[in-house]
Amino acid sequence: MGGSCAQRRRAGPRQVLFPLLLPLFYPTLCEPIRYSIPEELAKGSVVGNLAKDLGLSVLDVSARELRVSAEKLHFSVDAQSGDLLVKDRIDREQICKERRRCELQLEAVVENPLNIFHVIVVIEDVNDHAPQFRKDEINLEISESVSLGMGTILESAEDPDISMNSLSKYQLSPNEYFSLVEKDNPDGGKYPELVLQKTLDRETQSAHHLVLTALDGGDPPRSGTAQIRILVIDANDNPPVFSQDVYRVSLREDVPPGTSILRVKATDQDEGINSEITYSFFGVADKAQHVFSLDYTTGNILTQQPLDFEEVERYTINIEAKDRGSLSTRCKVIVEVVDENDNSPEIIITSLSDQIMEDSPPGVVVALFKTRDQDSGENGEVRCSLSRGVPFKIHSSSNNYYKLVTDEALDREQTPEYNVTIAATDRGKPPLSSSKTITLHITDVNDNAPVFGQSAYLVHVPENNQPGASIAQVSASDPDFGLNGRVSYSLIASDLESRTLSSYVSVSAQSGVVFAQRAFDHEQLRTFELTLQARDQGSPALSANVSLRVLVGDRNDNAPRVLYPALGPDGSALFDTVPRAAQPGYLVTKVVAVDADSGHNAWLSYHVVQASEPGLFSLGLRTGEVRMVRALGDKDSVRQRLLVAVRDGGQPPLSATATLHLVFADSLQEVLPDFSDHPTPSDSQAEMQFYLVVALALISVLFLLAVILAIALRLRQSFSPTAGDCFESVLCSKSGPVGPPNYSEGTLPYAYNFCVPGDQMNPEFNFFTSVDHCPATQDNLNKDSMLLASILTPSVEADKKILKQQAPPNTDWRFSQAQRPGTSGSQNGDDTGTWPNNQFDTEMLQAMILASASEAADGSSTLGGGAGTMGLSARYGPQFTLQHVPDYRQNVYIPGSNATLTNAAGKRDGKAPAGGNGNKKKSGKKEKK
């Protein structure tokens, strides 16, 4: 052979596939010339002008003896025109059988010089076959007990045409019992399935006759029909069931005849004859029935003839399992014929580094290997691949050598080692492959700092805890390995003083357990915050910090302390006077107590333990207010005694007691004779009383002078004097705490001061501002309340008219329900209180009370309850419990009158009570002053 390929053109109206221009490697070989013609073309039909496509002239056709050759010659060349003509009948289904692409290969030969050209004629399918069922009549037996939706596979039709001309769809004649469903075979075909739509009744209709039509996709479409005769039989409930709907098996084409390829198995849950199963082919092509055989009792499939991959690549076999009760089921067996490729590739590792640093950059060589396949051609060409999900890739080197390199960053903490599987696959059909797995260990680098289990820790520790006990534990994890992951703990900061931190807490370096070094006191230290650090042992070391907040919880370790009533300096009990005309509900006095604890432990309740007249008084459970239950009777004693117990809300509760001495009298003068039956004082006591009377007389004179002087000074000054200053130091008394002598040892020490102006005509107390300037020695008023009464008596006698015009309580300062502070709203007059909503509200209210009490103790706030203060007298102050924080003056009354503290304050400031009917003239005088 010699020469070159001529330029080719497309000739004729038929479709011609153009070849490439010239061969790439060998000048004597050309790309094939392609023609496309439909099957069943008439003899003598022109396929194409072969001479023209080969670049030959008309004269060259005969001169160079253009001709074609093939195993079976279906074509010839016209010696005059060079046209390629149809010589014999071309039936695509006969020539190519089931292959979808049908091609006939020819060799065009020319002489002088000798050249051979490859010609391929593609045979296109035409719709020359109608779908056809293997049987014109399909007989089915269906039990009347079959449930709705039960499907029965029908025999599929066969159409040797392909593509659009092949079998397209099925149709079923209209009926009310059955419908038709088309399903796809794995090989791309379709098969019909009869689905029951209405329950069968053999007694009503014992047989059904239907027509099944198969249509192809040609234009116009062709069709084939089959008659379906359905016999309804009595119940056989369970049809056979195959273990699989589709069986797949691969066979090498060189297996000998008689080889068992598969055994299908169906089971039937019925008993007796209905469970005996037989197997048979169903709708199988003749070719498949010649190649395979089926044992009808065992379901074993055997080969009968040698397999030929080039002729048939796949067989689809439908097998029906039927029991003796006429129920059946079907399965498909797909047999793949495998071309012979009997040598798998080999992988040989030549170099391997199994230890890799986790900070290695991409591109580091990990291993070298080569592949080898003893096959030749495409079966010996090998390509390599890696298992998915590994950070490596393969670089091809040369002569079947490869490098395994890193492809991305490594992380030992995420994956400490990799099992890398290298797969080698040849290009055979089907390809053979082999694999080799290598294990790569990642070496740790200290690239992870410790991480605490929580962003912040919060622990609650009850007070009075055991020193040395564990109060908390922090935990940090480090995913690194060895020393890089070993964590130690330490304290690095705190809101406590650094010098005293070690005396409060310590932390275990190994376990992170935090120990208390002392017993905590909630009243002294309620909360503190620590900063702990976790550090690994790497180089360089990495660390992390976390905050630990410790809340010291309260325990009921403080008993209530009674502030009022209190004992006198000599230990004697004071008394309160009650008007004889006091009506039910009248506020007699109030028991005032505090508790240094917080929360429920400071929630106080008041109980009457003993009373000289049980039905005369009532005691507020939460307020401590003593009120009249009924009016004083003629048979009731004017001297009453109440023993009151104050309990907190702790578990178990702690308590304290107080004794109230009440005397019913309209004035202090009536009270003094009641005490005349006391034992006659000794001479020393009488002498002391004489000096006291003289001193009080002098004080009264000085008091009057001080009043006159104060009036004169006020008239001279253009600005108002400091409210509440005492007019005369000798008349100003500074009293210390009236609680128990050791009450200052508690957490809430208080001191209460009050002044008594001499010009006050009403028998009531007035509370002014701080009196720190009062001399400490002037405490006579606190020593004996009886002396105070004797001082006030002349003033009372001097102005009885004013006493008769007593002003009612002032209401202009009282809080509304929405204005009252605290968590429980207004303070009602009942015996129950309202608990705070939560610990925060409780501590907030207690802090307000503590701050106000501290002001009173320091003398920086008025005892009259001025703006922004809660200062109050020892006798009529509120209880510092947590249930209410309203203005206390609305519930505190001066025994012996209907006036409240607000009346006194208003009169002192020159203001008349709202809605009152008091002495307007006197109020006017004060305003003038």
Curated annotation (Swiss-Prot):
Residues 31-133, 134-242, 243-347, 348-452, 453-562, 570-675 form the Cadherin domain. Residues 1-30 form the signal peptide. It is found in: Cell membrane. InterPro entries: Cadherin-like_dom, Cadherin-like_sf, Cadherin_C, Cadherin_CBD, Cadherin_CS, Cadherin_N, Protocadherin/Cadherin-CA. Residues 806-838, 899-929 are annotated as: Disordered. One of its GO terms (molecular function) is calcium ion binding. It is a single-pass type I membrane protein. Residues 713-929 are cytoplasmic. The gene is PCDHGB7. Residues 919-929 have a biased composition (Basic residues). Keywords: Calcium, Cell adhesion, Cell membrane, Glycoprotein, Membrane, Repeat, Signal, Transmembrane, Transmembrane helix. This is Protocadherin gamma-B7. Glycans are attached at N419, N545. It comes from the Eukaryota. GO terms for biological process: cell adhesion; homophilic cell adhesion via plasma membrane adhesion molecules; nervous system development. Residues 31-691 are extracellular. The chain crosses the membrane at residues 692-712. Residues 807-838 have a biased composition (Polar residues). One of its GO terms (cellular component) is plasma membrane. Potential calcium-dependent cell-adhesion protein. May be involved in the establishment and maintenance of specific neuronal connections in the brain. Its main location: membrane.
